[in-house]
Amino acid sequence: MPKKKDEFTLMRSLLHIKHRNVRWSNFLIDSAIDCNLVEKRALYLISEWVKINFVSRNLGVPENWKELIMHFTDEDLGVIGGKKNIPRTYQALKQLGKKFIAVEYTNEKGQKIKGRIHWIDAFYYNTVTKVYDVRISPEILPYMINVKGNFTTIDIGEAMSFASKETQKMYEFACKYSGDYRYSDRLSKEMGF
């Protein structure tokens, strides 16, 4: 499938990803979903894709959420999890489809609604084109698009550079409670490391 000149491609995005910011609702930061390092890196890149395709183009309304399919190649999977870990990255993407986040909200009638949502609806692999298609769940988008209050800004390039899921989570909490986000390289310099 040929790509348009301005179309988001994972590889092109990764060349410029350092210090790119995405907003997550604090609900996502505080959720009890347990992701490993590679799964979380995939979520950061999904967030970047959503930002480029829906926030930057001002398509953040439900009518535009029909085309929620992100395409990956083996090269893209290698960037997420390491060139020698493509099968592990493939497994991580499949696992994200099984992980649910508990949600609660009040509907327009004032009724409290409880449910469970996930990041990925479906995951496909085309054996001919060797392209992985990941369909993002539209239910997660309100927590990533047009978030105006109770959100955390994350530098995804920074977050992807960490080597453990615990460090990633700590960075998310640091961003949440710092009032602004901070890059670890500047923080390390200030602390004398």
Task: Set out the residue ranges of the language-model regions.
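Charged, alpha-helix-forming regions
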Residues: M1-F193
